[in-house]
């Protein structure tokens, strides 16, 4: 693990950069200046060079889409090609775990670390966790971090493909779900690597539940989806007695 020296910071919006408006808190641009001002106010700020970019427009992460994930992927690959050796992605917490998982697979075999963070309260709000999370993530990258996608939140490093948001009322909102591994790492085929062009997919996800009817499933399949992912019960089973 090599210390990151030339960081790319990608700001997507989210709570961390929200500002008060007459309609309440809203995603806002201009976070680079706020970040620089805060780091300059620290006596022991992380010592690494960084370049800042904003996803346009800044998002409330509840509005995250596949297209946004592809834009993030393109920006990160371009940053790698421009000589950056690490990425810090600032993201809203509602869908941060989804984006971390998506990027984990969109960026398979990426040779640099990608760290996602955000906050439960906006930067500058009383008692906010924003600057602690951001500066903590910078310190992790400065000290050296393995390649791949991970989440830094509330002093914890979490695997990007196994993180879930479990709470909305506390700073320790995220946890890494356990998954035993019994296999060895294998080379990533070129068709799955981060250089492979991607496109949006009309995908639906359906968790199974008691009372689900075949007509519900048929209506979803007839809606024009390209693929349907079924979230089955724990052992992979589902209802089978609907004669429709």
For each of these PLM feature ranges, what is it?
Residues 2-231, 237-244:
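Active-site histidine-anchored catalytic micro-motif
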């Amino acid at each position: 693990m090599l210390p990151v020296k030339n960081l790319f910071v990608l700001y997507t919006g989210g709570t961390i950069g929200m500002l008060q408006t007459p309609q309440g808190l809203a995603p806002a641009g201009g976070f680079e200046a706020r970040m620089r001002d805060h780091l300059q106010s620290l006596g022991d700020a992380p010592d690494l060079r960084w370049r800042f970019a904003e996803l346009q427009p800044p998002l409330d992460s509840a509005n995250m889409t596949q297209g946004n994930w592809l834009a993030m992927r393109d920006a990160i690959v371009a940053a790698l090609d421009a000589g950056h050796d690490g990425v810090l992605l600032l993201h809203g917490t509602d869908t941060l775990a989804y984006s971390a998982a998506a990027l984990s697979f969109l960026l398979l075999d990426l040779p640099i670390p990608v760290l996602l963070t955000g906050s439960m309260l906006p930067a500058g709000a009383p008692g906010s966790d924003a600057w602690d999370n951001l500066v903590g993530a910078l310190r992790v990258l400065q000290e050296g971090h393995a390649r791949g996608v991970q989440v830094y939140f509330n002093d914890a490093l979490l695997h990007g493909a196994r993180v879930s948001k479990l709470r909305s009322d506390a700073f320790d909102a995220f946890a890494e779900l356990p998954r035993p591994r019994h296999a060895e790492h294998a080379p990533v085929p070129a068709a799955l690597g981060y250089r492979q062009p991607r496109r949006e997919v009309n995908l639906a996800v359906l968790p199974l539940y008691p009372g689900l009817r075949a007509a519900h499933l048929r209506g979803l399949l007839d809606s024009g989806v390209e693929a349907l992912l079924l979230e089955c019960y724990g052992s992979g089973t589902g209802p089978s007695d609907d004669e429709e």
